[in-house]
């Protein structure tokens, strides 16, 4: 497996790898990473579909990429997905997946045209005082000291960030700024999370710094993530004859790690309650989704809370990874990520409006017609003075293809599930759907004497507790996540958010898809380049642009510095007068 960039590799069709007709594949899980691996198996490795087996413990595919209507409780989206134009592996894949709306076009075509015709941007990024615009006005609000703290993290080698927290690098100069409000709510970071991952994010999205305050950096699918991404992939795979085995829980995988060679030898499964084993040879490839951000997720309903049940269950993703990791040190250290769910949980809720009473309050904040079928909030609206640190969003409606046209689906999430609310004086994790809706209605400006009636009769709200949703952000060191294909592995690979690959960032669709692509290309020796992570961190133009925008347009000549520093800068600027360097610095408003 090798990395590449540019059209030469991107447009090439690889030859069929030697020996692929004698191989089979077993994929543990059916989340985005596993489905991507399956797609690359049949598209680029040209494995016969009937030899590809997807083992899924649930009755439906998709993993964390969900979006369903449950008959007894209503519409549910545990989360949403923010996309980037430089998700290189994602677009490499979806250029081949037919849309379920029109099979004559691909998912990429559909997505590209949609976001060209209806570009994303927010008209209100944050509110205070019960629905008033917080007027962050696109400003990051970083002092020179805060900017230098970010710069220090940006420049620190990975080795200096192992097991370090964000608060080891940022103090209140950063943590009380608009920048941190934008960042933590957009990406779901907490102050105690990994400084290493924070650095990766800064470097990965340096080209989008200017688009963070108003979300012009983002793009979204037309419908929820399940209907816009998962269903087209499943239909594509079924067209190749890929075998989906639902209600099939993988309880263990046995390995032989003797003599420097590592081989998966057996998969133990529980299929419809019956214990079975699958014996493996070197020609039987296993793709393992280890860990799981939505493991132990629970749903409540309009009148019941989502129970908090963090105990790791046998047969789940964490339990499986623990059993695997016990067999070889190169298989990672799951307990670095799942040891304390109090540090990794947050909650979401899906609010479905049932009449028109709530709509005017939404319109007042987002300044758009939510029934237009176009961008509504343009990303999350953060309630800055919320005890739960509540954020909410309406993507293009309908979010579900069968959603009634006179209803809206709102996604709400809170980072602080153990803190009391401002109207509902109890922690979010103890609240029913109705109570979470009441708290949201309070913060969007509904009169207090109407809140309870509206929450009860004008909306249906389904809460979701996710104890391990931020587990991948926990501080880590080298080896805590296994390499996608560990050294010496001959027939297995790790997939998803808890597998290690270079430079890319977790909690993204791209990361999942990238791990699937790299796994297939490595194990089957597919002779085509995997697109490298977009290299904006190495582009001086992006670095200059981000430097100025992070400082809200202030030039470097305006920085506070000792007299000797000012004199040195003055002398340096003299030396570049009339040069291409001076032209570049002026073009990007650095000087």
Task: Tell where the protein language model's regions lie, with residue ranges.
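Extreme N-terminal leader/targeting segments of oxidoreductases
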Residues: 1-25, 43-51, 550-591
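Glycine-rich Rossmann-fold phosphate-binding loop(s) that bind the pyrophosphate
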Residues: 29-35
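A short, Lys/Arg-enriched amphipathic alpha-helix followed by its capping loop at the start of a domain
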Residues: 37-50, 236, 240-242
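Glycine-rich FAD pyrophosphate-binding loop
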Residues: 42-70
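Conserved FAD-binding subdomain of flavin-dependent enzymes
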Residues: 72-113
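Rossmann-like flavin
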Residues: 100-207, 218-220
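Helical element adjacent to the flavin cofactor pocket in flavoenzyme catalytic cores
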Residues: 203-285, 290-291, 297, 303-304, ...
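C-terminal segments that line or cap access tunnels to active or ligand-binding sites in enzymes
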Residues: 207-221, 283-285, 290-515, 521-538
